[in-house]
A protein has these predicted regions:
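Bacterial N-terminal signal peptides that target proteins for export
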Residues: 1-11
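Bacterial N-terminal signal peptides
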Residues: 10-19
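A domain-start/cap signature at the N-terminus of enzymes
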Residues: 23-64, 72, 76, 84, ...
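Structural cue for short, hydrophobic secondary-structure segments
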Residues: 67-70, 102, 237
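Cap/lid segment of the alpha/beta-hydrolase catalytic domain
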Residues: 104-130
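Alpha/beta-hydrolase active-site loop
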Residues: 120-147
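The feature captures the conserved acid-bearing segment of alpha/beta-hydrolase catalytic domains
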Residues: 179, 184-271
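C-terminal catalytic histidine-bearing segment of alpha/beta-hydrolase fold enzymes
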Residues: 238, 247-253, 258, 266-308
């Protein structure tokens, strides 16, 4: 299967933890499937909560759009943040027939609130019990089996920390994505082996500490060919012209704010493709009068997802 091959080839990930579905144990149940249309439904999977919206009028070939939320606001849970995202995209899903899946990356298992611990948590595709990218693929596969072709590519959108997830998912699972949009991300995986994952294409061999009692070892070897394949996926990086707050320095990032960091990353990915005989399909759109606002950039994000 294409997605399965991509997981094996995209990264070599060795995880020193006891598997949830180990030898002799019961197999993991499939994620619950929601068939009712026209309503936002909260669903509880073994790895966390996610939200689903099934459009009332579905095309013959169902298209899945995964929305990845940003860092939850103070006093707001990941579940509340994910719910806010999906309700803001319902009209778009109805108009274009997208089935929406919105995972809630909570603090305990995905470090959603703190990007400076657990190697940035879900932003870097990491997770305590299941890696963040693997959870998304688990949910998508289940709904592809129920509503669409199992091998069908899907659409991916993320804002802020969710945009960081999208960038790293893309260079890990390039053949899974039909089109992607990143809105106002602060960091990106740079196309250089001189910077270690999740901030670059260099190898990562590290222990991730989730809490005092839980440590997870990872050995990650990014695959240059998958990164090159990622440059062939249509991707739009959106940043508001007023999104100029100075950010903390992270390895490999070129710039001090989301505006310059995003612009320079696309520029470097285009050059990376050209150096290897390819023409990148990445582009940047700078939106005048907009700051760091998911809702303010939604019309531009939605247009980018539907414009050839």
């Amino acid at each position: 299967m294409a997605l399965y091959r991509q997981i094996l080839l995209g990264f070599i990930i060795l995880v020193s933890v006891v598997a949830l579905a180990g030898c002799g144990s019961e197999p993991l149940p499939q994620p619950p499937l929601i068939h009712e249309s026209g309503q936002v439904t909260q669903v509880d999977d073994v790895f966390g909560t996610f939200y689903v919206y099934v459009p009332t009028s579905m095309p013959k070939q169902q298209q899945i759009l995964v929305l990845v939320h940003g860092t939850p606001a103070k006093e707001e849970s990941a579940e509340e943040t994910a719910h806010y995202y999906i309700v803001n995209w319902v009209d778009f899903a109805e108009e274009h027939g997208y089935l929406l899946i919105v995972p809630a990356f909570n603090q305990e298992n995905f470090s959603s609130r703190y990007g400076d611990i657990a190697l940035s948590g879900y932003r870097g595709l990491f997770g305590r019990e299941i890696n963040a990218d693997e959870w998304v693929l688990r949910l998508v596969r289940a709904y592809q089996q129920a509503f669409a072709a199992p091998e069908e590519q899907f659409y991916l959108y993320g804002h802020s920390a969710g945009g960081q997830f999208v960038a790293r998912f893309l260079v890990t699972h390039a053949d899974a994505i039909k089109r992607a949009v990143i809105s106002s991300a602060a960091t990106y995986p740079q196309p250089t082996t001189g910077v270690a994952w999740p901030f670059g294409m260099g190898e990562l061999h590290a222990d991730i500490e989730w809490d005092a009692a839980t440590s997870k070892h990872v050995d990650i070897i990014p695959d240059k060919q998958v990164w090159l394949a990622a440059t062939q996926v249509p991707l739009t990086v959106l940043v508001g012209l007023n999104d100029t707050d100075e950010l903390s320095g992270y390895p490999g990032q070129k710039g001090k704010n989301r505006f310059t960091i995003g612009h320079n990353w696309v520029k470097d990915m285009v050059a990376f493709a050209q150096e290897n005989g390819l023409e990148s399909r990445f582009k940047t759109e700078i939106i005048p009068g907009k700051g760091h606002s998911m809702s303010g950039l939604i019309p531009y994000s939605q247009q980018a997802l539907t414009t050839p």
